[in-house]
Structures are given as structure tokens and as C-alpha cells.
Amino acid sequence: MTNSSPQVRCYGTIQIGDISLECVVLNDGTSGYVQRQLAHAIGFTEKRPGSRFRRFLAEIAPNSLSYFDKTSQDVIRLPNGATATFAPCGILTEVVAGVMESASLGTLHTQRKHLVKPCSAIYRALAKTGEAALIDEATGYQRNRAPDYLQNLFDKLLRESASDWERRF
């Protein structure tokens, strides 16, 4: 834990199917996730997946470790008073892209092959939602749309492409 823990400025949750991910924006504007929940969304079941999750990142998404290392030791205090380890925005995209790339190269471990379809669907949904967000920001439309429009768009896109596994993700 660092001497001065980053302060949470904004807090909310993202839904990926039936999984809720706590997300935060820190006072310095850095956005990200609660690491434990991010690891759970990817498929880790233990309560404190720390070192196992980092080994997984090193294998699947080594590029994510460089910016993850800058913040991975940051302990944040959530609005409910609990503390959590911060995982920066971009980790989810790096992981799903890493799984897809490993699969295409034939290097994905057999026990992780089940991750390919959900990761592909998450990646596409994130890309399309990001594209919509950029257009909304450029046009000013984000001030006119419902506050949960992007979350609903993401859910819709994910469910359209993932009906066979959506109960897990």
C-alpha cells in the first residue's frame, strides 16, 4: 500500500452479462476497475487472485503489465469504506485481445480455449461502444442521451453475439 492512497472521485458498476464490475475514476482522472472483480469476470474464482492473475496477464496480455505495474499497487478506498486494488482501464481490452491473438497463433493453452468466443464478443462490443462514445462526444450528443445508453448498447451488442455463453459473461 502506498503512503497516500489514490482517492476515488466517481464510482459505478459495469455489467458484462450477469457479472458486475466495480469501476472508479480517481481524483487524477485515471479510470479503472477493482482488480478482484476484473479477475473474477475473466474466470478466476478465488477471493484474492493477485499473483495468479498477474501470471495470467504475463502470459496472455504482456503489454498490459507495463501500465498495470504503474498502478497495480494502488489501494483505493471505495465509497462503502472497503479497500481494493486498482486495475487501470485498458486491462480488459488487453486481456480479450491477448486471448484472441494467442488462439489465432495456436499458443492458447487447451484449458483456456473456452475463453475465445466470449473474449471475441466482448472485444467487438467494447469497440462498437467506444466508437459510439466518440461520435457522441464529438457531436455533443452525450448530453442528450440517457446516462446508461452506452451500458445498454454494450449489453445489447454482447447479447447479440454471445447467446450461447451469455449466462457466464
Residue map of PLM features:
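Positively charged, aromatic-accented nucleic-acid-binding surfaces
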Residues: M1-F169
